[in-house]
Amino acid sequence: MMFIRMKKKGLALFAMLCAFSAVVFMNGSAYAAQSCLPSGGATIKIDDTAYMRINYQFQLYGAWRDTGSGPAGTDATTDFFFRRNRLTVSGVATDKLSYILMLEHSGDRKIAPVEVVDEAVGEFNVLEGFVIAELSDAVKFNAGKMKIPFMREILEGCFSNLSLDRSLFIYSPYQRSRDTGVALWGNLLKSKIQYIFSAMDGQESVDAPKSSPRYGGRVHLALLDPEDTYGYSGTYLGNKMVLTIGAAAQYEPGAAYSDTAAQTGDKDYTAWTADLFFEYPIGSVGTVTLSGAYLKTDFDGAYTGSNPDPGSVGLDGEKKGWYAKAGYLHQNKIGPGQIQPYVRFEKWEYAELMTGMYRQKLTWIGGGLNYLINGQNLRIGLEYSVTDFEDESDPRSKDFTTINTMLQVGF
């Protein structure tokens, strides 16, 4: 039965990929791959049209938290780890087809978003691997493993964030930030409007009631300069005047059981978000950046079951909340670089944040400073944050303070 469900899902995605491939190769093929890549890198010219480019980037963190270690778990913890450590091969195959392959090692990390784990966690995988076909500016196709076209901050370049990192609380359940599938997207009305429709794997566990693609849609309206690539920047460092309003939704039928042991209580997954991004250079003084988003993730109350699917609860499970952030880039350099102070505020409510911890609310408040020596290609960051739990009756939900430092390099 499990094999049949997986086979049906695989056939559905395969059919979409076949249709995509037919369109691509009948029409000549795609679009320059867009990602959070640095300028420069090693470029290999293949012919007058085709080329391949190699980039390397990393973010090395030094982190401190005032809890998590010692016999009682109440002593301070220090941790050095690669938040991101990437080798990327991208390029253009024809005037209509481009591609990207991204390998990443992350870790070994002990300080997690709301806890300090006993054993450091690291991972090495193919983070992204997809092709982009451009039939016109209004009709483009992505196929492969790519960023999930849902939350704006997930779609923002990982090496162009305003704050040190994106929110810890906005990831999609099961697949988090990347998923495998297809996306139809494009720009309309001189790139004032962008749309994205996607069908991706979503939940793949044998414990799911159904095996169905996760369907998604996203649209944005750019009122000033366009944001017309598959993805955004967390800050354009004063090179654009941007005011963009976006919204997105996801749906996956039969994504989770409320009781996985008895395989009862079929629950659908739905989520929606709305976001706003504003960046404006103020003459020769500097650049103001403001951004925020609301997110609601719903598994139709799966957490109330006796043995809910793990993906329907916890950090990425059923929740609602929002974040807001603001920054200011000083135009004049101090020493070899520019400074960019920022602040960030988030409020979240979880159905079940940890086992038995229901309706927990948390507030995340942080601020920091970026020192941009060579734009985003050489950046030093410092961030101080406080995570405040509304209910501290559980020993696992005590307020804590975190200090992160970051060295970011890209070439």
State what each model feature region is.
Residues 35, 47, 66-67, 71-74, ...:
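Outer-membrane beta-barrel pore domains
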